[in-house]
Every structure is written in C-alpha cells, then in structure tokens.
Amino acid sequence: MSPNPFRRDVPARAAGTGSSGGRQARTPKGRRASGPGIVQGKQIVVRFARMGATGEAVASVAGREVAVPYAAPGEQARVRILSVERGRARGQLVALQVASPRVVRPLCPHFGRCGGCQWQHLEYPAQLEQKTALVRDALNRARIPSHLVSPAFGWEPPWEFRTQLEAVVGTREGRPVLGFFAWGGGRVVEVQQCPVQHPGNVAALTAIRAAWDALRPVAGAVRGLLSRVAAASGEVMLGLAATRRLHADERHLVVRALLDRIPNLVGLMEVRAPRRSHLLAGRRADLLWGRPHVA
C-alpha cells in the first residue's frame, strides 16, 4: 500500500481535479506561468488564505493562485510547483513552516489516498466556515450580494451523512477492487469503511464484494455501483453499473446473488454506464427487482 500523503512531515501526493480523478493539463517542464516566480518544478514559500472548491488550500503568489492539497488556511509552507494551467498552479507540500490549530487527524484511514473526501483534515466548524465562504465568493463574482448567504448548517455528529454512494470497480492482481478513485488519478482505492457514508451504503458495498464470486459471469461488464439510502427508514436502492445491457439470464443471476445479502434492500437496478464517463447518477436505468425509489 502506498504511503498516506496526509502525513504532513513528507511531501503530499500530486494535486488532482477532484474526486472524479480526471487528468490535468501540464505546462512543459520549466515553463513559467503568467506570474513571476511560478515555474513548474520550482519550490516557493506560500501562505494559504482559503480553501478551494476541490478541497485544496489556495495561496496567492504575485496575483496568481497556487492550490495545494492537505494544507489549511493560515498555514505557511514550502511547496513544489507541479503543474501550471491558465495561470493557476498546483503544488505539493514539501515542508510545513507554520501549522494551523484547526487541523485535525482525519477519522478515515483512507484519507489522503481516496478521492472521495478532501476536507477531513480540517475541524468541522472550519469546514463549514470555508464552505460558506465559497458560496459567498461565487455570488460576489456574479455581483450578487453575499449577505444573502446564511452560514452553512452542519450535521451532528458530522459523520454518516452521505445518503448516496458511487463506487467504482477495478482489478488488482486478478481480484476485484471496489472503492473510489484516488485523488488526481485513475487508480481505484479499495475502501472497506467510510465514516461519511450512511451505514446502509457501506453495507451494500460490502455485499457486492462478498457476492463477487457469484457475480463472476457478469464481472467483466460491471464497472461500478450506485447506492441510495433513505436516512429516516434505512431503505436501500442499489444500481449495478454495466458497460453493456445485461441478458435476461444475467439479470436473474444478479438478483439471486444480491437479494438476500443487502439489509433493507427495496430496489435493484441495472444502470447503463459506457466507459467514456465515470459519472453514474442520472443515467438510464432498468428495474431488475422491487421498486425504483426509497421512502
């Protein structure tokens, strides 16, 4: 297993574009950005002022933004510039010089590798403040009065609040790997637990993993799963994402393999998911069993 880049005494993993794991354009090595001092490969000292929408801490250098993951507002650090695009640079931590008292140890053991979360290194009140500031900043840029934005409401306790899960399927040494894309790359990080997901969604992920041998005849077509849970009732609806339309006998196989493995399951769907996109929500789906909604 690769080292967790959240360890703040070692360089962090390269910044990415968010949980989708999309690739980012890179400026040729040594090329200067549209601002003095920002050159790919160079190390500079920055002080972070705010969090960006993709979970990176953002500093301003000569009027240009430098975004670095796993840092926090108020911190000062030496960073290495990894890439430059359209005058905006991304970098990685090299040495933390001034730490923020609002940085905490993430609860999730996958944080720093998994691309599903980017904020767990900040204490929860700081997360809410930064998310409120993001909305206000967006309104300001649109010339809409930011005082219309109320402070963000939190979830107490701030765990198990996500009621929708999108997971991807990969392979490693011939075995299936179920989890989320790594931040900034196409590699799949296997996830056994997720403290921000509702337990019903985690149970669905565990059930798919346990049923994989039974699902092997269709495994080549399966690329992910979409799970939704009703927070009040605990009802779960599961969509199995496939790159092609499953045959009738394959659909029966999926129903038999999963029906008794997932607690509170009320609906099972086949989601059409061609390889050209990682997004699963909003795609065409066919009902295999039960009903197409939770209540």
Language-model regions, residue ranges each:
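Accessory RNA-recognition modules of RNA-modification enzymes
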Residues: 2-295
